[in-house]
Amino acid sequence: MNRKITVPEAMLPRGVKDFLPNKAAKLEYLKQSLKDVFHRWAFRPIMPPTLEYLDVLERGLGAGLRDKTFRFDDRQNGKLVAFCPDITPQVARIVATRMKGAPLPQRLCYNGKVLRHTEQQAGKDREIIQSGVELIGLQGPEADAEMIAMAIECLQSLGATEFTVDIGQVEFFHGVMDGLNLPAPQALAVQQAIARKDASGLSELLSELSLDDRKYAEVMALPRLFGGREVLDRAADIVVNDRSRRALENLRQILAVLEAYGVEEHVTFDLGELRGLGYHTGVTFQGFLSGMGTAVCSGGRYDTLTARYGMDAPATGFAFNLLNLLMALDRTLESAAVQPFDVMILQSGPDKRAAQSLARALRDQGYACARDIIERSLQDSLDYGRKMHFRHVMVVADQAGDVRLIRLADGSEQTISLQAVLAGEFRL
């Protein structure tokens, strides 16, 4: 009988992954490191469900995420349910419907998986792991600056040094576009040209419109307004509309707070960044690590989201894509994420009670230990211990005897009293 050989990846739907122990340990390290930063900034955990009713969830989704939502019939009641493509709308719903009487602002953090439809191309994740925060009920530039400073501190806590946080402001774009009165197809074409930084294509589109020189200059400037803080001055020399100038003042105020936090060196500006136009209501930002073109985190202000669930409250936040973060930091996490275990305990012969008592005593003392239950040679056990990241091996003779302690790093040995270890009188 012929058996078909199956590649492990072919056993999974496209866009999802198994995470073996090494990668899983790194992901857990990333989660915990971010959680520690969130806690230092006084954010409390919240846990939304995996499934939502589609009609409820879609209130909080932009058009882009609606198209990426996995949906199916609930057999219990026939209603459409969905796997969430983003956690922020869930948090907005919970605060608006379950925490209406809670004091504001609410500082909430989360970690979870989301699912998104993607195009059929290799390497595109459909299952994404997010860790993020939402600051609900607080308006003003200091709140937005707090989000950016937190994101920077998260990256610093992971040992990253070469990274930037690119800041945009959707109100700046809206101010430039006000008054053009373009039909939807033309407006979309202009928006796409700006997002691509396609100055020649943008100029060609604008040539079909009857714009005065000042308005033409404002629109044409958008693909070029990116860089350091000097971008704000360049933009101020170009735009004359009040809406865009208010957006620039907002960015200056945010920058002043970031300078007080001492993190301004990581900040750049991109006033042609148009991500989330139908979702964000002010500042937006994305974090990029050196050498990686995909953002590891993104965030911004979304003052209208909770209102879609019945509670009008300003809000801002951000989320890390842990898979992108893992891809960027994989090599640097090797020593930090893979923590060794303390001791593996061996005992030959039919009576294993001494080894079992020793294992329990060591765990009670706070050590991470395991019994090597398989009967094999000492050398095979030592080889196994090294591969499984144990620091020591203990070889037990009998209930009353001594214990042979072997340090796997260098092979050095010493003999210690079993009773001393059981009594907690010996420390590894």
Swiss-Prot record:
Gene3D superfamilies (alphabetical): Bira Bifunctional Protein, Domain 2
GO terms of biological process kind: histidyl-tRNA aminoacylation; L-histidine biosynthetic process
GO molecular function: histidine-tRNA ligase activity
Record's keyword terms, sorted: Amino-acid biosynthesis, Cytoplasm, Histidine biosynthesis
GO cellular component: cytoplasm
Pathway: Amino-acid biosynthesis; L-histidine biosynthesis; L-histidine from 5-phospho-alpha-D-ribose 1-diphosphate: step 1/9
Principal subcellular localisation of the protein: cytoplasm
Nucleus in keyword set: no
Matches recorded under InterPro entries: aa-tRNA-synth_II/BPL/LPL, HisRS-like_core, HisRS/HisZ, HisZ
Subcellular location, record wording: Cytoplasm
Top-level taxon in the UniProt lineage: Bacteria
Reported function: Required for the first step of histidine biosynthesis. May allow the feedback regulation of ATP phosphoribosyltransferase activity by histidine.
Subunit structure, as described in the record: Heteromultimer composed of HisG and HisZ subunits.
Further comment found in the protein's record: This function is generally fulfilled by the C-terminal part of HisG, which is missing in some bacteria such as this one.
Sequence similarity: Belongs to the class-II aminoacyl-tRNA synthetase family. HisZ subfamily.
Stated name of the protein: ATP phosphoribosyltransferase regulatory subunit
Source organism of this protein record: Syntrophotalea carbinolica (strain DSM 2380 / NBRC 103641 / GraBd1) (Pelobacter carbinolicus)
Phylogenetic placement of the source organism: Bacteria, Pseudomonadati, Thermodesulfobacteriota, Desulfuromonadia, Desulfuromonadales
